[in-house]
């Protein structure tokens, strides 16, 4: 961040495209730190990593597995806590920025689906996430399993939506940026 501050806006960061998690998370970091950075969007992490390695961009946010596979060194983690793959790397919270941006997914259903069906899918998801092969697969991807039942996931989803809306609106991110 000190390099970005010293560059006065001439500090380039890569992302996997406008509105992507790396884009939004880095915008949030720049705003939290009060620094100007220039967004360089790419069509995926392969292009962004090449740009980083060439020195065209100075930072890029991605998942631990991608960093490890490309021999990249993280300087901060956008997670609640440190990750096992890089235990020496502090979270942004530890560095004074209350920023948690993680890749997550869920299962959605159209409005009006019978509650009994939702309950069956919810139970099946909870059970699937306890299967040893599934746990091992997520572990190999350095992806923690965080199960939320339907009500918890709905509340989490609303909170994430508001968090993203705030960053997107404050930064003026529009489709195609």
Predicted regions and their residues:
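C-terminal lobe and pocket-closing loops
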Residues: 65-130, 162
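Short helices/loops that flank or line small-molecule/ion binding pockets
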Residues: 27-28, 32, 46-58, 65-71, ...
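An extracytoplasmic/periplasmic, membrane-proximal ligand-sensing/linker region
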Residues: 32-35, 115-177
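Phosphate-coordinating loops and pocket residues in cytosolic domains that bind phosphorylated ligands
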Residues: 2, 54, 94, 139-140, ...
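A local structural motif
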Residues: 9-12, 31-51, 56-57, 142, ...
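Short beta-strand and adjacent tight-turn residues that come in two discontinuous sequence segments
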Residues: 42, 61-62, 77, 148
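Short gly/ser/thr-rich secondary-structure transition/capping motifs
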Residues: 55-60, 90-92
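Hinge/capping helix and adjacent helix->loop/strand transition within the periplasmic-binding protein
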Residues: 1-47, 102-137
């Amino acid at each position: 961040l000190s390099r970005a501050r010293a560059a006065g806006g001439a500090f380039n960061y890569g992302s996997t495209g406008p509105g992507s998690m790396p884009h939004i998370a880095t915008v949030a970091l720049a705003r939290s730190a009060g620094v100007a950075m220039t967004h360089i969007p790419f069509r995926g992490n392969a292009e962004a990593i090449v740009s980083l390695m060439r020195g065209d961009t100075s930072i890029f946010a991605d998942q631990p597995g991608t960093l490890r596979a490309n021999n990249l060194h993280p300087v901060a983690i956008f997670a609640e806590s440190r990750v096992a793959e890089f235990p020496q790397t502090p979270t942004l919270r530890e560095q004074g920025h209350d920023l948690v941006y993680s890749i997550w997914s869920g299962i959605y259903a159209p409005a009006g689906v019978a509650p009994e069906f939702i309950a069956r899918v919810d139970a099946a998801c909870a059970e699937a996430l306890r299967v040893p092969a599934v746990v091992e697969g997520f572990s190999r991807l350095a992806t923690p399993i965080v199960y939320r039942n339907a009500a918890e996931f709905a509340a989490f989803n609303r909170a994430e939506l508001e968090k993203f809306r705030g960053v997107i609106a404050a930064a003026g991110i529009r489709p195609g940026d």
